């Protein structure tokens, strides 16, 4: 959580008043959620997602309370692998020269550590789909090259990715 303090200092340097945040109930709730989750993980990707979520609340780039609650729950329950797969399929890159195939080939091309581990990535995908974060149920349907590079995250998935993204990076886009 020290990283949050450093980033808050950067926000103060850019004009965010920390006194106002100290009185902001939404921000205080976000810090409490993030702190509780952070105490139960050592995974750097999750700690970074928590830091970014709190910072997005601080700068007013967060969804309503109901979505924030869901998003914090997903940060806690999804693995770093889930987060990487979700981000990959927001803008998937296919193998050069691949004219058709399944999304599993895109996954294995971009994440070679998952080659031959269908039992793992199928479960990860099932979790993402059942949470409504991706819009395609199955990784193993044959499709065209254009289909392989089509965005697979849902509107909810995009909102979740934005919530756990560094607000400084989002502002730079």
Residue ranges, per PLM feature:
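Charge-rich, amphipathic alpha-helical segments
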Residues: 1-61
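Long, helix-rich, hydrophobic modules that act as membrane-proximal anchors or helical bundle/coiled-coil regulators
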Residues: 40, 44-173
């Amino acid at each position: 959580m020290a990283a949050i303090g450093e980033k808050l200092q950067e926000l103060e340097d850019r004009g965010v008043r920390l006194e106002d945040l100290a009185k902001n109930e939404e921000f205080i709730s976000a810090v409490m959620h993030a702190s509780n989750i952070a105490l139960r993980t050592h995974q750097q990707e999750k700690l970074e997602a928590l830091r970014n979520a709190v910072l997005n609340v601080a700068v007013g780039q967060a969804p309503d309370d109901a979505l924030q609650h869901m998003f914090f729950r997903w940060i806690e329950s999804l693995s770093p692998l889930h987060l990487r797969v979700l981000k990959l399929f927001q803008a998937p890159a296919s193998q050069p020269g691949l004219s058709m195939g399944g999304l599993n080939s895109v996954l294995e091309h971009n994440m070679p550590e998952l080659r031959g581990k269908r039992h793992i990535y199928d479960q990860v995908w099932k979790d993402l789909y059942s949470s409504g974060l991706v819009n395609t149920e199955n990784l193993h349907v044959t499709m065209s090259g254009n289909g392989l590079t089509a965005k697979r995250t849902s509107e909810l998935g995009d909102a979740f990715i934005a919530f756990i993204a560094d607000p400084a990076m989002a502002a730079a886009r």
